[in-house]
Amino acid sequence: MYQPDFPPVPFRSGLYPVVDSVQWIERLLDAGVRTLQLRIKDRRDEEVEADVVAAIALGRRYNARLFINDYWRLAIKHQAYGVHLGQEDLQATDLNAIRAAGLRLGVSTHDDMEIDVALAARPSYIALGHVFPTQTKQMPSAPQGLEQLARHVERLADYPTVAIGGISLARAPAVIATGVGSIAVVSAITQAADWRLATAQLLEIAGVGDE
């Protein structure tokens, strides 16, 4: 049963782009996306605070679900919709502070053991990856593939799930067909020849999510 320790998110969050700049956040919100993540890596809090503030303000303006990757203190300080954490960040994060601030929590997983760890934290949603080979970040694990993804989705049948990793426009329909609630994409949009067209096509496949 879906009883998170954090505020819930819709069972289906639809298309979920993960981007590294406020410019991309604004572009995608304007294009109709309603679930996004700002992921800026390896910078100090004070270096990214202005971007976090601007992204959160845009999310509010468009009534969107904007998650901040990693910078949970800034997300709390400026009242983001939610925080996304990698498995390696869970131990070093004050989950009680995130919960007390009323922020949603998403957690990355790569196998059954990490799903167990995520479930113990009772987050708002669980991300499952990486589904396909990806150039976006170095991954210590092998790609899961569609069969493994479908198995994880079945295991988490009543939990909001997000598939991530190497999901292209061509692969998106098969990923959605597993029953996963959301697809997170990076280069499928940011490296597309026509990002507006790619976004529109991905929205057609994955939707904007439930209200």
UniProtKB/Swiss-Prot annotation:
Superkingdom, taxonomy of origin: Bacteria
SUPFAM superfamilies assigned: Thiamin phosphate synthase
Binding-site residues for Mg(2+), renumbered to this chain: D70, D89
GO biological process: thiamine biosynthetic process; thiamine diphosphate biosynthetic process
CDD domains tied to this protein: TMP_TenI (cd00564)
EC code: 2.5.1.3
Family per similarity comment: Belongs to the thiamine-phosphate synthase family.
Protein name as it appears in the record: Thiamine-phosphate synthase
Name of the gene this protein is made from: thiE
